[in-house]
Amino acid sequence: MSGNEDFIYDDNSSSSISNQTDGGGGGGSSNNNSGGNANNNNNEGDREQDRYLPIANIIRIMKKALPNNAKVAKDAKETVQDCVSEFISFITSEASDKCQQEKRKTINGEDIIAAMVSLGFENYVEPLKVYLLKYRETEKNSNNKRSPKKSESSSPPESPPLAHLDNSINSGYQPPPPPQQQQQQPPQVQQQQQQQQQQQQQQLQQQQQLQQHQQQQLQPQQQQQHLQQHLQQQQPQQQQQPPQQQQQQLTTTTTTTSTNNQQYQQQPQQQQQQQQQQQQQQQQQQQQQQQQQQQQQQQQQQQQQVQPPYILQQHNIQQPNVFLNQQAQQQQQQQQQQQQPMMNIQSHQQQFPQQHQIQQHLQQQHQHLQQIHNMQPPHQQMQFNQQFQMSQQIQMPQQFSNNNNNNNNNNNNNNNNNNNNNSNNNNNNNNNNNNNNNNPNNNINNNLNNSSNSLHNSGNSLHNSGNSGQIPPLYQQPYISTNPEYPSTS
């Protein structure tokens, strides 16, 4: 906003703003002064007194919101002074812009509120509206009181202009009359009429309020009168009633009083019962909580007993669940280790069914030989041993000796061959064991081979023992073999 413009404050005031600049709150002066005084006003606008509000007023307002012992620093006072003055200048400039757009010269309270909204102070709009209404009402009341005085003293104010004219004639200068007075004369009459109407309305309102107040005061008196009349009407009726009806009325009244008394007596009993029930419920809850705590303590003790003491010392007896988990893991590992050979055997049986069948066949033969040996009585075994020893001492015939020698040679050869085979098998087994320690399947194969070789050697040893020496007739029974590798004896 630029340029020097004239605007009028408030609805009822006749002061104006002059020399208003952008964002600056210059001091106001009347337009009745001559043009020579304009420069002086511009120079005065630069002073702090014209730019800022008086700091004394600001201090009073601030102290109202503070306790008695509180103090305000100088910096705080100055900052509040600056903020308030700038705030006023911003709002007035915004309101003047609105008036300029609407081609008006007066700044109303509504214009200030609109400026507040446009600047973003929406939270303060409603209380300002309420304050504006109250302010206008108070001004109307004050104007109504002053209106008769103004009507009486309307003639004396005309004398100062005459004196002013005489002075101006003597001085040689005659200024024109102010146009505002000419324009404001009819509105004054209108204002007086409005004030009179308002006074009448206020008087009517006051009368209505007085009437209402009187009615409110008379209401209890009227009620008492009605009650008295009603009682007076009932008394002759009661006198006319027979005694039986009076007794009935008395009984009804007594019953009502007794029921009321019983109700009043039952109320504390019910309250006591409710309190007892609540106490019992609380006791039950406490017992349940104690039982739960005891169960938890027992569980903790059991967990601590399961764990060894040195583990509890290392871990400060604060992690029982961890140790239980470790023990469970160890048990699972042991079970897995125990189940591994069975699983490996089953997998080997599935992969090598022929070897499994051979192993079963050898086991059956071994059991059959043991059964035959156990079936012989002990005295026959002793006789066999004695005869075998005697056969070595007594000189036998040539044929028998030759046969025995041939048999012995054959047996020795067989024994040597068997021993060689056994040694080879053992070496092979050792090599297999050394080479295949890491593979579980190979270990199973080696075990099966070792067992088959041991059974093979035991069968050879029994076969050789049967061919050596002279066998008594009791032991010369044929041995029928189920395996093609071992020939049957005849």
Curated annotation (Swiss-Prot):
Record InterPro entries: CBFA_NFYB_domain, Histone-fold, Transc_fact_NFYB/HAP3, Transcrpt_fac_NFYB/HAP3_CS
DNA-binding region: 53-59
One GO term of the biological process aspect: regulation of DNA-templated transcription
Domain of life (superkingdom): Eukaryota
GO molecular function: DNA binding; DNA-binding transcription activator activity, RNA polymerase II-specific; DNA-binding transcription factor activity, RNA polymerase II-specific; protein heterodimerization activity; sequence-specific DNA binding
Principal localisation: nucleus
Keyword list, A-Z: Activator, Coiled coil, DNA-binding, Nucleus, Transcription, Transcription regulation
GO CC list: CCAAT-binding factor complex
PANTHER family to which the protein is assigned, alphabetical: CCAAT-BINDING TRANSCRIPTION FACTOR-RELATED, NUCLEAR TRANSCRIPTION FACTOR Y SUBUNIT BETA
Role this protein plays: Component of the NF-Y/HAP transcription factor complex. The NF-Y complex stimulates the transcription of various genes by recognizing and binding to a CCAAT motif in promoters.
Stated family: Belongs to the NFYB/HAP3 subunit family.
Name of this chain's protein: Nuclear transcription factor Y subunit beta
Species the sequence originates in: Dictyostelium discoideum
Primary gene name: nfyB
